[in-house]
């Protein structure tokens, strides 16, 4: 049997797929790492995996960033044992909202910085998680007292992730 008759994808497609898979593995690793961290407050983690979504958006485009965010939540949740639990639902809602917000900001706000994109993603992530928790799990008015500090922490986290994304992107562009 001649193996030359099998179709081969172009090299640039293989490189793109390999880059996406490397980013996915990094995002999953950060998802698992963050799950082991003690929270900085109720429902708050630093959002390091969203940094990888932002890098995927910058380096590969919106479809790859969105699919990376989805794959990261599903596979990461499988590995930490939260797949199809309330934690998974909250994580999926927040991760998808962050990815969509970052894509929208990147596309429709001319001249926005990576920090700005990351800030909007972090705020969308937190607000969506908060709305998900409030609508599906905890219907208590007192829950709203937690929102201002959570949004403040999200802004800090979004700023740090945006700055890190800028640094990493500059290093990658320098080496490419």
Protein language model annotation of sequence segments:
Residues 63-71:
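Transmembrane-helix signature of polytopic, membrane-embedded enzymes
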Residues 30-46, 71-100, 137, 142, ...:
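Interfacial aromatic-anchored transmembrane helix boundaries in multi-pass membrane proteins
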Residues 2-56:
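Hydrophobic transmembrane alpha-helices
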